[in-house]
A protein has these predicted regions:
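Hydrophobic/aromatic-rich core segments of domains that either
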Residues: 121-203
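Residues embedded in well-ordered secondary-structure elements
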Residues: 6, 53, 151-153
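Sec-dependent N-terminal signal peptides
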Residues: 3-13
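Alpha-helical and coiled-coil interaction segments, frequently adjacent to or embedded
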Residues: 183-232
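A generic secondary-structure signal for well-formed alpha-helical elements
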Residues: 12, 68, 72-76, 133-137, ...
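Secondary-structure boundary elements
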Residues: 19-117
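A generic structural signal for short coil/turn motifs at secondary-structure boundaries
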Residues: 13, 17, 148-150
């Protein structure tokens, strides 16, 4: 069964990133901007407002993605706390996993009430809004690497993003990275939308993202995990 699922996703994934050049997101983006600061307590109402006026799956998902990127901020204090815990428990994944589960309630509360979160919150919010619009969306846990993350020493996943199925094809996206950047010098999150992580080409995406479940690579051209982590 798993082999069948792998082949199904891989076949669809090979086409991901193709056929999107003629899609206009102007209407979806304008709708996303109509609801700044909309309460997440009324999440279904938000999903309906963002997607009902739009005719296609890709436009509906674009409106959801853009709204999240424009209205949700990375919580700097939470980001630092999680980073510190990862460092402290870098050799004890069981302890870190226990802390993460215990801390999840605070993460959800912060997201719903303050519109702030970290990667886990971004990816779960994208998924929930998409599912409310009848769009198949999956949270992908795995490893990421950038200038802020010491990836070589990673022993458990350190990031989350999404896979979304649109028109029977799977695509990858990372709303955390699309929404802005962390400026450590000022200890602030700087909103700065980056479209590069929206429905990205899997061959490009894998340069910075490696899923725990390799089904979600969506490409057969990729490094091994050890190569990705720089251990080889």
């Amino acid at each position: 069964m798993r082999h069948f699922l792998f082949m199904l996703i891989l076949t669809a994934g090979c086409a991901a990133g193709q056929g999107l050049t003629d899609v206009s997101y102007l209407r979806a983006d304008s709708i996303a901007r109509l609801y700044p600061g909309h309460s997440l307590i009324q999440m279904k109402a938000l999903a309906d407002k963002l997607t009902t006026p739009l005719p296609t799956e890709i436009e509906k998902f674009r409106a959801i993605y853009m709204w999240v990127c424009l209205n949700i901020e990375t919580d700097y204090d939470l980001y630092v706390k999680v980073k510190s815990k990862r460092t402290r428990h870098r050799n004890d994944p069981v302890a870190l996993s226990y802390w993460s589960k215990k801390h999840r309630a605070l993460l959800i509360h912060t997201l719903l009430n303050n519109n702030k979160t970290i990667c886990t919150g971004y990816s779960y919010l994208i998924r929930e809004l998409a599912l409310m619009a009848n769009i198949n969306c999956h949270v992908v846990d795995g490893y990421s690497r950038n200038t802020r993350i010491g990836i070589r020493s990673a022993i458990i996943p350190n990031h989350s993003w999404n896979a979304v199925r649109i028109n029977n094809q799977w695509y990858l996206c990372d709303a955390t990275w699309s929404s802005g950047i962390i400026d450590n010098s000022s200890e602030k999150f700087i909103p700065r939308y980056n479209d590069a992580w929206f429905l990205a080409d899997p061959k490009v995406f894998v340069r910075d993202h490696f899923p725990s479940d390799t089904i979600w690579l969506l490409t057969d051209q990729h490094p091994s995990l050890d190569e990705f982590l720089g251990r080889l």
